[in-house]
Structure formats: structure tokens, C-alpha cells
Design a protein with these regions (language model features):
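Ribonuclease/tRNase effector modules and their secretory precursors
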Residues: 1-151
């Protein structure tokens, strides 16, 4: 289970251990959703989610989110803490990069962006809304081989 007391290295190692288990389920889910999305030519919202619980007791959400012409594919799990919730995500289903969205970041995003502009996220949680609206991100490598991103 991902908890807020884990270090970034521990979170990354745990996520990569789960990835080998998730890979086949991700491929099957993508095939199903992509086929349905192409067949029905949706205009508007198309949301499909699947929750997979691994042997390590991590609940991963695989989400296919489409809004009008654009769509995004997310693989993420919550990082549970005492008060707030962060997320750990995988960047792709082939050669994943583990992305950590800290509880502090998610709390500030809710306070300073969603609440400030009175935005309704609809059926999306804050992480899904952020990922859907900020898909143009620049990943920058740090000297310790970790990344941070600029959106």
C-alpha cells in the first residue's frame, strides 16, 4: 500500500513491482476502450475506469478519459495519508516513468486553482482533471536521475 510516509525511492520501487502485474490488464482495457471510442465517435465526455488491486494491496485505477476530440490515458494509485491524498502515476503502458504527485501539490491545486476559479470537475477527481487539462508538460531530469515537470 502506498502511504505518505514512504520515500520517493520506495514509492518508485513499489510501483515498478506492480507494473509487471498491471501490464496485461492495461493492454486489454485499452483495446476495449479504444475500440468502443472509435466505433461510437463520441462528441462530449467518454469516461471509462477500471480499478485493479494487486497482491501488494495497491489499488490502481486505469482510466480512459475523453473530452470532445482529445483523450488521455491514466494509470494511477492514491498515496494515502492522514489528512490529504496524493497520487503516484505511471506515464505510459510500455516504458513507464513513475510520477509522484505529492499531497501538498494536490491540496494547493485544489485550493489555488479549482476553488479559486470555482471550477466544477464533474465526474473527474482533482488528479484526473489536472491530467486532462495539463497534458502539455515538460519533464526535466535532475542530477540524481529523478524528474520534475513544468506544466
Amino acid at each position: 500500500m502506498f502511504v505518505s510516509s514512504m520515500s520517493s525511492e520506495e514509492l518508485c520501487a513499489e510501483a515498478m513491482k506492480d507494473f509487471s502485474i498491471l501490464q496485461t490488464k492495461i493492454d486489454l482495457f485499452m483495446d476495449r476502450c479504444g475500440k468502443r471510442y472509435r466505433q461510437e465517435h463520441f462528441i462530449g465526455r467518454f469516461i471509462k475506469r477500471m480499478v485493479v488491486t494487486t497482491k501488494r494491496n495497491n489499488s490502481w485505477t486505469i482510466a480512459f478519459l475523453a473530452l470532445n476530440e482529445g483523450f488521455t490515458f491514466l494509470i494511477y494509485a492514491p498515496i494515502t495519508g492522514q489528512e490529504t491524498c496524493g497520487y503516484i502515476a505511471l506515464s505510459s503502458n510500455r516504458n513507464p516513468l513513475v510520477l509522484e504527485y505529492t499531497p501538498h501539490f494536490m491540496q494547493r491545486y485544489r485550493e489555488r486553482y479549482l476553488r479559486y476559479y470555482n471550477l466544477e470537475t464533474g465526474n473527474y477527481n482533482a488528479f484526473e482533471y489536472f491530467s486532462l487539462k495539463n497534458n502539455n508538460t515538460l519533464y526535466v531530469r535532475q542530477p540524481d536521475n529523478s524528474y520534475y515537470f513544468i506544466s
